[in-house]
Design a protein with these regions (language model features):
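Transmembrane helical elements of multi-pass membrane transporters/channels
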Residues: 86, 120, 149-153, 157, ...
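Alpha-helical transmembrane segments of multipass membrane proteins
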Residues: 58, 66, 99-103, 122-130, ...
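Helix-terminus/linker motif at the lipid-water interface of multi-pass membrane proteins
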Residues: 68-74, 130-137, 201-228, 232, ...
Length: 403
C-alpha cells in the first residue's frame, strides 16, 4: 500500500485543487450577483470533474506497472497491482466528491461540504475489516472499501442536488453551453493548487532523504510519526484559510476590496489563536502522544525521540495561519499561480535551504533539519503574508483612485 500511497495522494491533491478552482470562480460570480454565471461555472465544474476522473483512472491503470518498477516495487509488484488497479477503478469516487465539496463551499454550505468527508472516513474504517478479513478480499478488499466509502459520500451529494433539489446553485445540464474559458478559469486556480499539494509530498520525501543521510532510519521513523501529529495540528488553521477562499472570491466579485482586507486579517487572527492553543497542547502532552506511536516493545525506544520532536516542531503550527491564509486568499482572487509561487518559495527554496544549511555546514545534523524547517517555514509564511497585504492594499488604492 505504501507504494500506491503517493499516487493516491496525487488523486486527492487533484480533487482538492480543482475543487479550489471551482470554489474561486463560482464565489466570484456570486459576489458579482451573476447567478447565471455561477450556475454555468457549477455545470462546467461538474463536467470537468467527470472528465478528470476518467482521465486519471485510465492513465494510472495504464502506467501502474512501469511506475511501480521505477519506485522499486518489483518484488511486491503483484500485491501493489492487486490494490492499485481496484483503487484506481474507483477514481471517480475519490475526485468528484471533493470537487462538489468545493462547489458547496462556494455557496456557503459548509455542512454539506464537510459532512460527506466525515461519513466517508467513518465508512472506510468500518468497511476495511469487513472486506479485508470478513470477506477475505485482502489488499483488493482494502481498495474496494476505500472506493465504496467514497461512493457513499458521493451519493449523499447526489441526493441533496438531484433529489432534495434545495441547493442554491443549479447543477442542471439542460441548457448547458460549453465555454472553454470557464474550464480555463477553473484550471487557472485548480492546477496550481493541485501542484501545491504535490510539492508538499515531494518535500516530505526529500526531508526523509536528508534525515537518512545525517541520522539514519530511526530519525525517519521519528519524523514520520511526529509529523502525522503536526499535520493534524495544522488542520484548524488550514480550515480557516480554506474558508477564506470563498469569502475572498465573493468580495472580489463584488469589488468590495475592504472586505478582502478584513478577511485576511480575521483569518490570520483566528487561525493564530487556534494554532497557539494547539501548539501548547502538543507541547504539554507530547509524551502521551508519543506513546501512541511507541507502545510496542519494538518501538518503545522511539518515545523520548518523538517527544522531543513534538516539543520542538509544535512551533511550526504557529506559522501556518500566515502562509495558508495568503495562499488561499490568492486562490479566491483567481491568482492560482501566485499561490503556487509562494508555496514553492516557502517549501522548495526556504525550508530546504535552511534545512540543508543547519544540518550540514553548521553541523547540527538531525536537529538542524528540524530547525531549518522551522526557520524556512517562518520566513516564507511572513513573506507570503506581507505580499497579500501589499496586494490588497493596492486593490483598495486602485479602486479609490478610479473613483
Amino acid at each position: 500500500i505504501g507504494y500506491i500511497t503517493p499516487l493516491f495522494m496525487i488523486l486527492v491533491g487533484v480533487g482538492n485543487g480543482i475543487g479550489a478552482g471551482a470554489n474561486s470562480l463560482i464565489s466570484r460570480f456570486i459576489g458579482a450577483k451573476d447567478k447565471k454565471g455561477a450556475d454555468s461555472a457549477t455545470a462546467h465544474s461538474l463536467i470537468l470533474s467527470i472528465i478528470i476522473s476518467i482521465g486519471f483512472m485510465v492513465l494510472f491503470i495504464a502506467i501502474l506497472d512501469p511506475i511501480l518498477k521505477i519506485m522499486g516495487a518489483s518484488e511486491v509488484l503483484n500485491y501493489c497491482k492487486e490494490y492499485g488497479v481496484v483503487l484506481f477503478i474507483w477514481t471517480f469516487s475519490l475526485i468528484i466528491p471533493t470537487i462538489i465539496g468545493g462547489i458547496f463551499r462556494a455557496e456557503g454550505d459548509v455542512n454539506r461540504a464537510t459532512l460527506p468527508l466525515a461519513v466517508t472516513a467513518i465508512a472506510n474504517m468500518i468497511l476495511d475489516p469487513i472486506f479485508i478479513y470478513g470477506l477475505n478480499q485482502g489488499l483488493a478488499g482494502a481498495a474496494l472499501a476505500t472506493g465504496i466509502a467514497g461512493l457513499i459520500g458521493l451519493l449523499m451529494q447526489i441526493y441533496w442536488i438531484y433529489v432534495k433539489k434545495n441547493t442554491y446553485l443549479s447543477y442542471s445540464l439542460k441548457n448547458f453551453k460549453n465555454n472553454m474559458k470557464m474550464y480555463a478559469d477553473i484550471l487557472a486556480v485548480g492546477i496550481p493548487a493541485s501542484l501545491e499539494q504535490l510539492i508538499m509530498a515531494i518535500l516530505a520525501i526529500i526531508v526523509n532523504f536528508l534525515l537518512t543521510v545525517v541520522a539514519g532510519t530511526t530519525a525517519v521513523a521519528v519524523y514520520t510519526a511526529g509529523w502525522r501529529i503536526i499535520s493534524v495540528g495544522i488542520i484548524p488553521a488550514v480550515g480557516v484559510g480554506t474558508a477564506a477562499v470563498t469569502v475572498a472570491g465573493v468580495s472580489y466579485g463584488a469589488r468590495n476590496y475592504d472586505k478582502i482586507k478584513t478577511t485576511v486579517r480575521y483569518a490570520v487572527k483566528l487561525g493564530f489563536i487556534v494554532s497557539l492553543i494547539t501548539c501548547i497542547l502538543i507541547h504539554v502532552f507530547a509524551g502521551q502522544i508519543a506513546y501512541i506511536f511507541s507502545y510496542s516493545s519494538n518501538s518503545s525506544q522511539l518515545a523520548p525521540l518523538i517527544t522531543k520532536f513534538l516539543q520542538l516542531m509544535c512551533l511550526f503550527v504557529l506559522f501556518v495561519p500566515f502562509g495558508a491564509t495568503a495562499a488561499n486568499v490568492f486562490q479566491g482572487l483567481g491568482k492560482g499561480t501566485v499561490s503556487l509561487g509562494l508555496t514553492i518559495m516557502r517549501e522548495f527554496i526556504l525550508v530546504l535551504l535552511f534545512a540543508c544549511l543547519f544540518a550540514f555546514p553548521l553541523g547540527l545534523g538531525e536537529i538542524g533539519v528540524y530547525i531549518g524547517m522551522l526557520a524556512g517555514g517562518f520566513i516564507g509564511s511572513i513573506i507570503a503574508y506581507i505580499i497579500i497585504e501589499i496586494y490588497v492594499k493596492r486593490l483598495i488604492g486602485g479602486q479609490k483612485h478610479g473613483a
